[in-house]
């Protein structure tokens, strides 16, 4: 699992060059070292993206204080503009990341097994 601030793949009205630079410089390292999940924030919405030819789950976590509009892009498994937070639980065999809205409702769960 790798955590960062800026997204590598995500819908955002911000400059595309920011993501393109991450795709060029960081994504090859994540693939080389067989990272399972890249988790970030920065754009204040929930997104789960799985790009073609990659086994990496790209996760964007929302913010409890501010939420921004979102729409699906290629590889989107889930997206939501709801404000909230995520909880991650891990054991020897499984990782569960739950995206939770400000009322405490689980909006989406990502599960990775080893």
Question: Where does each model-flagged region fall?
Answer:
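His/acidic metal-ligating clusters that form di-metal
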Residues: 1-59, 86, 106-109
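Binuclear metal-dependent phosphoesterase catalytic core
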Residues: 47, 51-114
């Amino acid at each position: 699992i790798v955590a960062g601030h800026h997204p590598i793949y995500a819908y955002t009205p911000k400059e595309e060059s920011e993501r393109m630079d991450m795709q060029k410089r960081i994504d090859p390292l994540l693939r080389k070292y067989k990272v399972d999940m890249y988790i970030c924030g920065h754009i204040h919405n929930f997104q789960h993206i799985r790009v073609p030819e990659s086994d990496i789950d790209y996760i964007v976590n929302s913010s409890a204080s501010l939420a921004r509009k979102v729409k699906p892009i290629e590889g989107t498994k889930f997206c939501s503009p709801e404000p909230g937070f995520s909880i991650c639980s891990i054991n020897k065999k499984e990782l569960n990341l739950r995206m939770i809205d400000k009322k405490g409702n689980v909006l989406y769960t990502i599960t990775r097994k080893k």
